A protein has these predicted regions:
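Short boundary/loop segments of OB/S1/cold-shock single-stranded nucleic-acid-binding domains
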Residues: 53-107, 113
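Eukaryotic non-catalytic protein-interaction modules, chiefly N-terminal intrinsically disordered
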Residues: 1-65
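OB-fold (S1/OB) nucleic-acid-binding surfaces
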Residues: 99-105, 109-141
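Alpha-helical segment of the N-proximal tetratricopeptide repeat
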Residues: 202-229
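Eukaryotic short linear interaction motifs
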Residues: 116-119, 132-135, 143-147, 165-168, ...
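OB-fold/S1-family single-stranded nucleic acid-binding modules
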Residues: 160-201
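N-terminal accessory interaction module
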Residues: 125-132, 150, 154, 165
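Short nucleic-acid-contacting surface segments enriched for D/E, G, S/T with interspersed K/R
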Residues: 140-160
Length: 229
């Protein structure tokens, strides 16, 4: 009888990469199609929050216990950034997106419905104006900033020429590799739909509220956040 041996960490990562490679290669056969068996809004958000609870924003697990992670970025079928003026782009919605395609000549307007998870990318669940939701992975952001300061719940943003693809885990998502392909909208930007504008909430805040928030962030050494307030 052969003695059973527990798989090593190297074995587990080899399996992960082989599985991801197979998923991404098979995804090419669905290029131009809409995703099937797409998760519901509740399923998207529940899975996102579950992963946040497992990994934690900084990758920890149990209090006082260190968890080492190997961060991976599997880039398959890379695409160039958008280089045309924004004014020439046509607005699209999530239902218009097709798998394994960078939607040239288009843009999509989204709003984050959860606080982000932090892997190699800043990962969130976002909705369009029709209430449809999708996973969004934004790469190459400033590593000195907390993910929540980049993409807090409620943040409205634009993705230019969105690249809609199958992720290495097998589900659909929008992948943003180029920092110039995402535009974060603030305050009263005219591109924000009226129903998404935080005008009433912001006007109701007193100047002391802004000051207190700024001081709190500064004391916590969250300097980017403090500067915003």
């Amino acid at each position: 009888m052969f003695r059973f041996e527990e798989p090593t960490v190297e074995d587990e990562w080899l399996y992960f990469f082989k599985r991801a490679e197979r998923i991404l290669k098979e995804a090419e056969a669905r290029k131009g199609q809409k995703p099937f068996n797409k998760p519901s809004r509740l399923q998207y958000i529940s899975q996102h929050n579950f992963l946040k609870g497992v990994a934690g924003e900084e990758g920890g697990s149990e209090p006082g216990k260190r968890t080492d992670r190997l961060l991976t970025n599997i880039a398959y079928n890379e695409h160039p950034p958008c280089i045309v003026p924004f004014a020439t782009l046509e607005k699209k919605f999530l239902d218009d997106l097709r798998l394994e395609m960078a939607h040239r000549g288009s843009y999509i307007l989204l709003r984050a419905v959860v606080d982000p998870n932090n892997y190699v990318s800043v990962t969130t669940i976002a909705e369009d104006e029709n209430g449809e939701v999708e996973l969004v992975e934004i790469y190459n952001q400033d590593g000195r900033r907390s993910p929540t300061s980049i993409m807090p719940e409620g943040q409205v943003f634009i993705v230019k020429e969105p690249y809609f693809k199958t992720t290495s885990h097998g589900g659909p998502g929008i992948r943003v590799d180029h920092v110039s392909d995402v535009i974060f909208l603030d305050g009263e930007d005219e591109r924000i739909p009226e129903k998404w504008r935080p005008r009433i909430r912001l006007l109701a805040r007193r100047s002391l509220d802004w000051k207190d928030d700024g001081n709190r962030f500064y004391k916590g050494k969250q300097y980017f956040e403090a500067a915003q307030w």
